[in-house]
From Swiss-Prot:
Name listed for the protein in its UniProt record: Aspartate-semialdehyde dehydrogenase
Pathway terms, separated by semicolons: Amino-acid biosynthesis; L-lysine biosynthesis via DAP pathway; (S)-tetrahydrodipicolinate from L-aspartate: step 2/4; Amino-acid biosynthesis; L-methionine biosynthesis via de novo pathway; L-homoserine from L-aspartate: step 2/3; Amino-acid biosynthesis; L-threonine biosynthesis; L-threonine from L-aspartate: step 2/5
Subunit structure and binding partners: Homodimer.
Active site (record annotation): 136 (acyl-thioester intermediate), 280 (proton acceptor)
SMART domains: Semialdhyde_dh
Originating organism: Bordetella pertussis (strain Tohama I / ATCC BAA-589 / NCTC 13251)
Catalytic activity field: L-aspartate 4-semialdehyde + phosphate + NADP(+) = 4-phospho-L-aspartate + NADPH + H(+)
Family affiliation: Belongs to the aspartate-semialdehyde dehydrogenase family.
EC number: 1.2.1.11
Residues annotated to bind phosphate: 103, 245
Protein's UniProt keywords contain Ligase: no
Domain of life of the native organism: Bacteria
GO biological process terms held by the UniProt record: 'de novo' L-methionine biosynthetic process; diaminopimelate biosynthetic process; isoleucine biosynthetic process; lysine biosynthetic process via diaminopimelate; threonine biosynthetic process
Length: 376
């Protein structure tokens, strides 16, 4: 018998990717989907969901209460408004959420089952009912480096990120493309003239970038032809919230730190927004607990998850396989630039790329739903 599952936020960017992945993997054969909407209750369910009833009101607590499992990609404001009311009304079901709202709550598990399935299983056994997707950058990094973390080889790690526009949302992606288009328009006559001086073209681009009329309401400053070395809120101590998440969430995913009675792994670095569309990249400096030969490190990484792909540390392989353009739309997490650093044999350099909308958002939720279907 199929389980009824409530789906909220299925039309947004993350939700749309989640729905496509569920269709690709035939997950809908395992559930009876109940589609909710925050703005179109009573409307038609998606045409591809055969037999699904009309859209339910996503704020109707009584309707939500009937479901043993709810999956939401509606965002943090929705979670903040609806979740407490739902639990307050006595609902005991499983809540699977893409938003960060509940991520660090004591009664929530951050889900990334290829890396932390034992943590998830233990939580289900003790009655945990809240399962939340992790920060996109953290999840993609762990999918690549699980082999090192799960073999307890990482003493500390520094991560310098190159994060895509998609991390901000759909409107941020649109704004980036709009900026690129306007910058091109500003110098197109010069670009079309082979005799035009490149410095004249450069001055034209800069003038347009610095023009206050360039659309920048979402990023706050131009991102096209630029970068922004700050993501998310200012915590007031020189650290951004995005940077704080690296250590906090990695350790929670792995079941480490004070809450688990084990030492946390120190992780810190800087988070930077770049003009890529939907893949987050990271340059990593890793202090290993012991000197491990590079070929053994490569084997451990390749065996860590089936999606981790070691890229040979050559120029040709790197530029072909270790880029956002190569990775977008795939579940592969390539890990490359692997080499021992000059600081010593325990210091490892690495670079990894992951699709922010797949392992960084939708895929852990989809897989958690599969796990929950055996438990609900």
């Amino acid at each position: 018998m199929t389980q009824a599952v409530g789906l909220v936020g299925w039309r947004g960017m993350v939700g749309s990717v989640l729905m496509q992945r569920m269709r690709d993997e035939n997950d809908f054969a395992l559930i009876e989907p109940v589609f909710f909407s925050t703005s179109n209750a009573g409307g038609a369910a998606p045409a591809w969901a055969e037999g699904a009833g009309s859209l339910q009101n996503a704020y109707d607590i009584d309707a939500l209460k009937k479901l043993p499992i709810i999956v939401t990609a509606q965002g943090g404001d929705y979670t903040s408004e609806v979740y407490p009311k739902l639990r307050g009304a006595g609902w005991q079901g499983i809540w699977i959420d893409a938003a960060s709202t509940l991520r660090m709550a004591d009664d929530a598990i951050i889900v990334l089952d290829p890396v932390n399935r034992p943590v998830i299983d233990a939580a289900l056994k003790r009655g945990v009912r809240n399962f939340v997707g992790g920060n996109c950058t953290v999840s993609c990094m762990l999918m690549g480096l699980a082999g090192l973390f799960n073999n307890d080889l990482v003493e500390w790690m520094s991560s310098m990120t190159y994060q895509a526009a998609s991390g901000g949302g759909a409107q941020h992606m649109r704004e980036l493309l709009t900026q690129f288009g306007l910058l091109n328009q500003a110098v197109k006559p010069l670009l079309d003239d082979p005799a035009a001086a490149i410095l004249d073209i450069d001055r034209g681009v800069l003038a347009r970038q610095q023009d206050p009329s360039l659309p920048q309401e979402h990023f706050g400053v131009p991102l096209g032809g630029n970068l922004i070395p700050w993501i998310d809120k200012d915590l007031g101590d020189g650290m951004s919230r995005e940077e704080w998440k690296a250590e906090a969430e990695t350790n929670k995913i792995l079941g480490r730190g004070a809450a688990f009675g084990t030492p946390a792994t120190p992780i810190d670095g800087l988070c930077v927004r770049i003009g890529a569309m939907r893949c987050h990249s990271q340059a990593l400096t890793i202090k290993l607990k012991r000197d491990v030969p590079l070929d053994e490190i490569e084997d451990l990484i390749a065996a860590g998850t089936q999606w981790a792909k070691v890229v040979p540390n050559t120029k040709e392989d790197t530029v072909k396989a270790l880029t956002p353009v190569a990775v977008t739309g795939t579940l592969d997490i390539p890990v490359g630039r692997l080499r021992k650093l000059s600081m010593g044999l325990q210091y490892l350099g690495a670079f990894t790329v992951g699709d922010q909308l797949l392992w960084g958002a939708a895929e852990p939720l989809r897989r958690m739903l599969r796990i929950a279907l055996a438990e609900a």
